[in-house]
Each structure stands twice: as structure tokens, then as C-alpha cells.
Amino acid sequence: MDKVCAVFGGSRGIGRAVARLMAQRGYRLAIVARNLEGARAAAGDLGGDHLALSCDVAKEHDVQNTFEEIEKNLGRVNFLVNAAGINRDNLLVRTNTEDMLSQLHTNLLGSMLTCRAALKTMIKQQRGSIVNVGSVVGLKGNSGQSVYSASKGGLVGFSRALAKEVAKKKIRVNVVAPGFIHTDMTKDLNEELLKKNIPLGRFGDALDVAQAAVFLLESPYVTGHVLVVDGGLQLTM
């Protein structure tokens, strides 16, 4: 049976690194991003017969159409990675409601919608694996990231509850929780200052997180787990 993996947020950063590893392992990939050109570029870099799609994960209709296109072109999805995410860092008293909702909708609701759509086919197959990309601040919290922390903390609770719901269907759900990783989201941070708080003394790379995500995707006896990939940052928070 074909191994079909949908990677939301697959056009850059962690999602793109996951897609690269999965392609090397023989998976057929659907690279999904808001920006279709970015998705096409990422899919093209992989070589082979991979699919590029545009989707706003916070819109139910978009998500449903995306899964229909994947099934029509690649087959039923049996692996799902939710790496789409945004941040709008600010103190809560300075955060407007629009920025609150955009983070909650993309980071939490979006993963709920993609998981629900994927489960419809995974349950029929009686197998499947889902990895949601969280964050260490969803576990520890961080000043100036209260809303982002809430969205990622909510993702952990959601993933653990979902893991319980679908375990009897042979479907696994896990979370990878990165710390400071070299991506577009961290490019403006003061790395020299921040890495002093990281026991391993450096920011991670997208590949560091991707390797952990692939481990969770393929480990048949791991579910409901949160794998922190942060160079030891949580030890100091």
C-alpha cells in the first residue's frame, strides 16, 4: 500500500525539512501551504511525483477540498504532519483581538480541522500516524508570547486527547515541541543572547526537528507523546 503523507506548512522551515526526509524514505507527499508557488517550489525540489496545494487551514471548506484533491491524485492519506503556524509576539495588553484569533485559528483550529479530515480516511484504513508541531513555550510559557503559548499548549492537550480517541483504530497522534530553531519565525531574534540560555549552546536547525517528527511518524508503539527538541532550553525556563 502506498505511503501518502500530507505536510501542512510544507513549503518552508520545519515542514519542508520533514517533507524532504519523507520523500527520501519513499513516501508520496502532498506539500500544502497558503502560498501555492511556495508549495510548488518545495514539491519540485523533492523530485518525483509529489503534489503541491494551497490551503488556509483555518477554513473548513479549504481543508476538505485539499484532502479530496490529495485522495484523487495520490490516494488516501495515512500520514499527516501539521507544521503550519504563525506568531504575533506581544504582551497581552498590547495584543489586539485580530492577532489573538489569527494565532488560535491557524495554530490550533487549523490542526483540529486537518486531523478531522485525515481521520475520515485513516479510520477506514484502520491505520495512520499524525504529528502536530507544537512548541516548548506551549509547555513552559514565555513572556510576550501568551497567546502563542496558549495556541501551542492547546495543541498538546488536543493531541493527547485525540490519541486516546483513535488508538483502538490503530491511529497514533504525537507532538514534536521545538525550541529556538533557525526558521523565518526566529530570523529576527538575537541569537547570540538567547543561545546563552540553551544548554547545548546553539539554535537548532529544521532538520533537527524533522528527524524527531519522522521518528514519531514511524514509531508503531508511540502515541500521545510530546517530544521536546530544544537543546535543553526547557531545563532553564
From Swiss-Prot:
Binding residues annotated for substrate, in chain numbering: 135
Principal subcellular localization: mitochondrion
Enzyme class: oxidoreductase
A Pfam family of this chain: adh_short_C2
Enzyme Commission numbers on file: 1.1.1.100, 1.6.5.10
Keywords: Acetylation, Fatty acid biosynthesis, Fatty acid metabolism, Lipid biosynthesis, Lipid metabolism, Mitochondrion, NAD, NADP, Oxidoreductase
GO biological process, one term: fatty acid biosynthetic process
Binding site for NADP(+): 11-14, 34-35, 56, 83-85, 148, 152, 181-183
Record field: catalytic activity: a (3R)-hydroxyacyl-[ACP] + NADP(+) = a 3-oxoacyl-[ACP] + NADPH + H(+); a quinone + NADPH + H(+) = a quinol + NADP(+)
PROSITE patterns reported for this sequence: ADH_SHORT
N-acetylmethionine PTM sites in chain numbering: 1
Modified residue annotations for N6-acetyllysine: 195
Active site residues per record: 148 (proton acceptor)
Pathway: Lipid metabolism; fatty acid biosynthesis
GO cellular component terms given for this protein: mitochondrial matrix; oxidoreductase complex
Any GO molecular function: NADPH dehydrogenase (quinone) activity
SUBUNIT field: Homotetramer (in vitro). Heterotetramer with HSD17B8; contains two molecules each of HSD17B8 and CBR4. Does not form homotetramers when HSD17B8 is coexpressed, only heterotetramers (in vitro).
Assigned protein family: Belongs to the short-chain dehydrogenases/reductases (SDR) family.
The protein's role, per its UniProt record: Component of the heterotetramer complex KAR (3-ketoacyl-[acyl carrier protein] reductase or 3-ketoacyl-[ACP] reductase) that forms part of the mitochondrial fatty acid synthase (mtFAS). Beta-subunit of the KAR heterotetramer complex, responsible for the 3-ketoacyl-ACP reductase activity of the mtFAS, reduces 3-oxoacyl-[ACP] to (3R)-hydroxyacyl-[ACP] in a NADPH-dependent manner with no chain length preference, thereby participating in mitochondrial fatty acid biosynthesis.
Protein name: 3-oxoacyl-[acyl-carrier-protein] reductase
UniProt source species: Bos taurus (Bovine)
